[in-house]
């Protein structure tokens, strides 16, 4: 999988301790639509892309006694839906792990419904939808158990 980074123990993006995997690509729709340079992850745009074997990521996750979920985010996971599905296939089938997997997307649900359908067979998937819109008050999301930056953003278990 092509990634920009991994945080083995993340406590801010989901209610459970997570491995946070930074995806590699984004079209920066939040900036384009707001007309502002507002991307919370713009530093990642210049980070190098690295390729890491799915098995290495899964083993790293499973060997950590703290983490209880995996979160994909940082840039746009839906830009790598094929790679994420391949990862999930190994995670669920080969390693028999049913832990929560969360995807933070800037897309609205109706924009990625085909991609959502690809995720359903893997079970226990949560997707955070909605672009970052600057100058909004953060709100608590009950599904994720964390505050989201814009009031149009929400998570759904699919």
Question: At which residue positions do the language-model features occur?
Answer:
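Short glycine-rich anion-binding loops that position phosphate/pyrophosphate groups of nucleotides
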Residues: 26, 77, 132-133
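Canonical radical SAM enzyme core domain
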Residues: 44-59, 78-121
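Canonical Radical SAM [4Fe-4S] cluster-binding loop centered on the CxxxCxxC motif
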Residues: 11-52
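Auxiliary Fe-S-binding modules of radical SAM enzymes
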Residues: 2, 6-15, 62-65, 95-158
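Conserved glycine-rich "GG(E/T)P / GGGxP" loop and the immediately following alpha-helix
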Residues: 66-91, 138-140, 144, 157
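Short, conserved beta-strand edge motifs with alternating hydrophobic and charged residues
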Residues: 22, 69-74, 102-104
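Generic preference for flexible, low-structure residues
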Residues: 19, 37, 55, 86-88, ...
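Short, low-complexity, polar/charged sequence segments that are solvent-exposed and flexible
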Residues: 22-24, 41, 89-92, 121-122, ...
């Amino acid at each position: 999988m092509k990634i920009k980074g991994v945080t083995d123990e993340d406590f801010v993006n989901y209610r459970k301790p997570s491995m946070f995997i930074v995806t590699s690509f984004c079209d920066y729709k939040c900036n384009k639509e707001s007309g502002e340079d507002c991307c919370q992850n713009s530093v990642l745009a210049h980070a190098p892309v690295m390729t890491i074997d799915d098995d290495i990521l899964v083993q790293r996750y499973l060997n950590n006694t703290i983490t209880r979920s995996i979160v994909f985010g940082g840039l746009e996971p839906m830009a790598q839906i094929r790679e994420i599905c391949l990862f999930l296939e190994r995670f669920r089938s080969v390693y028999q792990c049913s832990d929560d997997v969360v995807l933070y997307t800037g897309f609205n649900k109706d924009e990625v419904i085909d991609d959502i359908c690809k995720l359903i067979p893997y079970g226990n998937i949560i997707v955070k939808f909605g672009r970052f819109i600057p100058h909004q008050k953060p709100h608590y999301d009950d599904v994720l158990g964390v505050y989201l930056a814009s009031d149009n953003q929400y998570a759904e278990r699919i």
